[in-house]
């Protein structure tokens, strides 16, 4: 399945920078928030096209939406999906995502 270049921006929302994600970077695994409708092959294709790297594997997590309350009104935060992408050794994605490091 070929994706249009306009669709690439919509699938990957942002990289995740947490303690766990930082530890995973040392193992050549990078964490991204992605569109909940995205599949593993779509995520792999997008990462390989945008960053020009070789993806070995992808693990995804569907995180639940959380209940939020403002005054007497109860609402929900939107649900989201997180992808942990494993790259081949020596791939230069870190320089693209974090140029200051």
From Swiss-Prot:
Record's keyword terms, sorted: Ribonucleoprotein, Ribosomal protein, RNA-binding, rRNA-binding
GO molecular function: rRNA binding; structural constituent of ribosome
Pfam family, one: Ribosomal_L23
Keyword Nucleotide-binding part of the UniProt annotation: no
UniProt GO cellular component terms: ribonucleoprotein complex; ribosome
Swiss-Prot/TrEMBL GO biological process terms: translation
Superkingdom of source: Bacteria
PROSITE patterns registered for this protein in UniProt: RIBOSOMAL_L23 (PS00050)
InterPro entries xrefs: Nucleotide-bd_a/b_plait_sf (IPR012677), Ribosomal_uL23-like (IPR013025), Ribosomal_uL23/eL15/eS24_sf (IPR012678), Ribosomal_uL23_CS (IPR001014)
UniProt entry tagged with the keyword Ribosomal protein: yes
Quaternary structure and partners: Part of the 50S ribosomal subunit. Contacts protein L29, and trigger factor when it is bound to the ribosome.
Matching PANTHER family: 60S RIBOSOMAL PROTEIN L23A
Annotated function: One of the early assembly proteins it binds 23S rRNA. One of the proteins that surrounds the polypeptide exit tunnel on the outside of the ribosome. Forms the main docking site for trigger factor binding to the ribosome.
The family this protein is said to belong to: Belongs to the universal ribosomal protein uL23 family.
NCBIfam families hit by this protein: PRK05738.2-4, PRK05738.3-4
Protein name listed in UniProt: Large ribosomal subunit protein uL23
Species this protein is from: Trichodesmium erythraeum (strain IMS101)
């Amino acid at each position: 399945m070929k994706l249009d270049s306009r669709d690439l921006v919509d699938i990957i929302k942002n990289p995740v920078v947490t303690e766990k994600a930082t530890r995973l970077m040392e193992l050549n695994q990078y964490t991204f928030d992605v569109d909940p409708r995205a599949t593993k092959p779509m995520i792999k294709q997008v990462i390989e096209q945008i960053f020009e790297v070789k993806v070995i594997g992808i693990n995804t997590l569907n995180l639940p939406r959380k209940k939020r309350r403002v005054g007497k009104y109860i609402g929900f935060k939107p649900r989201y999906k997180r992808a942990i992408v494993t790259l081949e050794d020596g791939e230069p994605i870190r320089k693209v995502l974090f140029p200051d490091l």
